[in-house]
């Protein structure tokens, strides 16, 4: 039993020494808590912020929103039907094939 008493005494002494070492830190911490009482109360922000974050994915700007919207549309679009008979590029137009250009109602400033 006598062997346990010095161990207990040494443990108490160590605790006192630790308290002395950490007491300046605790004193500084107490000063900061007195000066800024609202800090450290609610980690993670206000209730409003937490509620908004729980609602789901939010977008950085309208570009992100539109890109996500386009991705969703692309997944829902049906594939093009292959039964189209219209072929493009088989005929090269000539000036005679093109329709006549309509004259402009506003006179050009360049035509003198």
Curated annotation (Swiss-Prot):
Phosphorylation at Ser-62 by MASTL/GWL during mitosis is essential for interaction with PPP2R2D (PR55-delta) and subsequent inactivation of PP2A. Phosphorylated by PKA. It holds the Pfam family Endosulfine. GO terms for molecular function: phosphatase inhibitor activity; protein phosphatase 2A binding; protein phosphatase inhibitor activity; protein phosphatase regulator activity. Residues 1-11 have a biased composition (Low complexity). Isoform ARPP-19 is found in all brain regions and also present in non-neuronal tissues. Isoform ARPP-16 is enriched in the caudate nucleus, found in low levels in cerebral cortex. Residues 12-32 have a biased composition (Basic and acidic residues). Its main location: cytoplasm. The modification N6-acetyllysine is found at residue 109. Protein phosphatase inhibitor that specifically inhibits protein phosphatase 2A (PP2A) during mitosis. Inhibition of PP2A is enhanced when ARPP19 is phosphorylated. When phosphorylated at Ser-62 during mitosis, specifically interacts with PPP2R2D (PR55-delta) and inhibits its activity, leading to inactivation of PP2A, an essential condition to keep cyclin-B1-CDK1 activity high during M phase. May indirectly enhance GAP-43 expression. This is cAMP-regulated phosphoprotein 19.
């Amino acid at each position: 039993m006598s062997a346990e008493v010095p161990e207990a005494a040494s443990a108490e002494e160590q605790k006192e020494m630790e308290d002395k070492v950490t007491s300046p830190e605790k004193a500084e911490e107490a000063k900061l808590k007195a000066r800024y009482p609202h800090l450290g109360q609610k980690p993670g922000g206000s209730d409003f912020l937490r509620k908004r974050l729980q609602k789901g994915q939010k977008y950085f700007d309208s570009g992100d929103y539109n890109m996500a919207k386009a991705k969703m549309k692309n997944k829902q679009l049906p594939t093009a039907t292959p039964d189209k008979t219209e072929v493009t590029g088989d005929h090269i137009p000539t000036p005679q094939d093109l329709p006549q250009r309509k004259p402009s109602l506003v006179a050009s400033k360049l035509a003198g």
